[in-house]
Amino acid sequence: MKYFVVXXALVAAFACIAESKPAESEHELAEVEEENELADLEDAVWLEDLADLSDLEETRGFFGNAWKKIKGKAEKFFRKKAAKIIAKKEGITKEEAEAKVDPMSKKQIKVYLLKHYGKKALQKASEKL
């Protein structure tokens, strides 16, 4: 367990260091934004898999309260990400976007995010061809 905590702390530290490097040109800014969006897609997929595991009886028994915290953070992450995408897409403020996301169910939010990132992945794949 100690090794897991140390490894998680190191990963978080390296991620923070990588995110803190300033981009110097427009090309580098575009690359950084693309990397962040791809990382967000990977986060969304990982958290979706994580949310699916919450239904397993043995998982709930094994992790207990820690699992509830992780699941709660995943839901908050999904809501924030959906609000950010809506604000950017529709050109509205963050608060207005959050007001649009609030009445949505957890399933609707996940479907919205998967559609959004699915379209982006398809566009990037078609550009490479």
UniProtKB/Swiss-Prot annotation:
Which GO terms fall under molecular function for this chain's record?
Answer: toxin activity
A GO cellular component entry from the record: extracellular region
Where it sits in the cell: the answer is: Secreted
What does the tissue specificity note say? Expressed by the venom gland.
Signal peptide bounds: 1-20
The alphabetized list of GO BP terms reads: defense response to bacterium; killing of cells of another organism
Which residues of the precursor form the propeptide? Answer: 21-60
Recite the UniProt keywords alphabetically.
Antibiotic, Antimicrobial, Cytolysis, Hemolysis, Secreted, Signal, Toxin
Similarity comment: family membership: Belongs to the cationic peptide 06 (cytoinsectotoxin) family.
The protein's job, in short, is: Insecticidal, cytolytic and antimicrobial peptide. Forms voltage-dependent, ion-permeable channels in membranes. At high concentration causes cell membrane lysis.
> Can you name this protein?
M-zodatoxin-Lt8l
Q: Which organism is it from?
A: Lachesana tarabaevi (Spider)
